[in-house]
Curated annotation (Swiss-Prot):
Residues annotated for Mg(2+) binding in this entry: D321, D327, E330, D331
EC number(s) given by UniProt: 6.1.1.20
Subunit and partners: Tetramer of two alpha and two beta subunits.
GO biological process: phenylalanyl-tRNA aminoacylation
Protein name: Phenylalanine--tRNA ligase beta subunit
SUPFAM superfamilies named in the record: Class II aaRS and biotin synthetases (SSF55681), Putative DNA-binding domain (SSF46955)
Gene of this entry: pheT
GO terms for MF: ATP binding; magnesium ion binding; phenylalanine-tRNA ligase activity; RNA binding
Cofactor list: Mg(2+)
PANTHER family the record matches: PHENYLALANINE--TRNA LIGASE BETA SUBUNIT, PHENYLALANYL-TRNA SYNTHETASE BETA CHAIN AND LEUCINE-RICH REPEAT-CONTAINING PROTEIN 47
Amino acid sequence: MVTIVLNKYKLLDKIHIGQQKLEDLLFNLKSEVKPIDENNIEIEINADRLDLLSSDGIARSIKGLLEKELGEAKYNVTDTEYTLIVDNVRTRPYALAAVVYNAKIDLEELIQFQEKLHGTIGRKRKKVAIGIHDLRKVDSKTIEYKEVPLSYKFVPLYENKELTISEILEKTEQGKLYGNISIANGVSPAIVQDDGEVLSIPPIINSNKTRLDETTKDFFIDVTGTSFEAVAQTLDIIVSNLAEAGGTIGRVKVLKSANSSQLSSPLFLHKIQNVREEYVKKILGIKTSKEEICKHVMRMRMNCDIENGVIRVTVPQYRVDILNEIDVVEDIAMSIGYNNLEPSKYISTNYGSYDYMTLLERKIRELGIGAGYVEISNFVLIKDEKLFSNKYVKILNPVTDEYNAVRNSLIPGLLDFLSKNQHAKFPIRVFETGDVVVYDSSTDTGFRNDKRAAYAIMDNKVSYEDIQAPIHYILKSLGLEVNYKEENNNIFIEGRSASIFYENEKMGVIGEVNPDVLIRFGIEYPAVIAELYISEIAKRLTNQR
């Protein structure tokens, strides 16, 4: 949830209803109101409803529920003479801009709105940063987004003298908080007029030159970041809310210097989401019609049409919470009112049962214990230096370097355990079952979760045969007659390792640990290890059922 503080009288004046009615309607929008004092209220808003983070956004939604305005809001949009030239900025490559004229806003609320967007879609300015300037104080019609050296000087916000960017990083609170996000190789991103004067260094601080005050009605807005989609969404959210405050949106021509591409900003992109009548009925348990569904969609301030029997919802870009059909159904439920949805008397006669993978993992653990192994449990996170494959998920901001990667095998964890228990009574037989994250180019992220089991023996004298026998027993007990094919890798001794196959499908690896690997982990005794791919085993066993 995101919390905002608003003047209740200003908000109520925009929608002309009483406070209790306001609270009831906000509850329908999954928001809660708490009084602070005579004049102010605190509103908790769902973190995905970024369009509701200002009084104007809230007023827009409530006008729909009151049926004072239906469908997507229509705003005055005009072309301007302003141009933003986007140069090659390596740390934050994307930028868009817009102008808003004659918006009647509360300055304190606008700053709150900006910071709430920074904290949500902006990921504390790492993903998106917003600069809002007094348009009267912008001298140039051509603005450039580019890299500048840290020796560049300007007067930062609320300061009265010029500072270099280096000094801003050292002396100002904003510089200390956000300087590490975008500064690299001795340069900083900057929004600069064509005369060279700096308007801002995103995501750190604006220039004092374009500082907002209570008389500001015309705005120049820049949005920069690491994701073009997030930059476009953020700008659309801001300008649409300012337009609700009576503003006229001015388009800015955006030129990409690298490839000479050109676009008009803000983009005002829309997407079409088809909604099935039967799906709405099933999810909400109500009797309805296509026309009734469209009416509720319009009350939620989106356009809706019925074409050839298909309900087509037009989703504005500032509704970042609408990802698929179920999100539209949720909006319909909010329009109806959750209190108006009657619970159905449904008694389930089904009983819960364990997932097949859970049962298989339990069986493998029981077989491991029966074979004389002691179960251990390691963390899923591991130090990247202990991994054998360079294809792994790296933690971006680890709390400690000891846990800066996600394991892609259980073997490093077992070896680490053996290295710390060489004083224990021999032989040491241990095993572990658990999740790993492995490279998979066919997935949208490039990685997938995999379930595995690994077994290890350490003794004064131990060989391949010592580990093969119990592994063969475990697999045979599962109903798999496997074969072993000699296959070398960097973990095991050449000629003393194999891959485990079942009907030409690889089920795991097994072998004597290479002395170089033992030295790397500080192990002074020989060890043998096997790792089974439970996910692959499950597929085979499922096919046999």
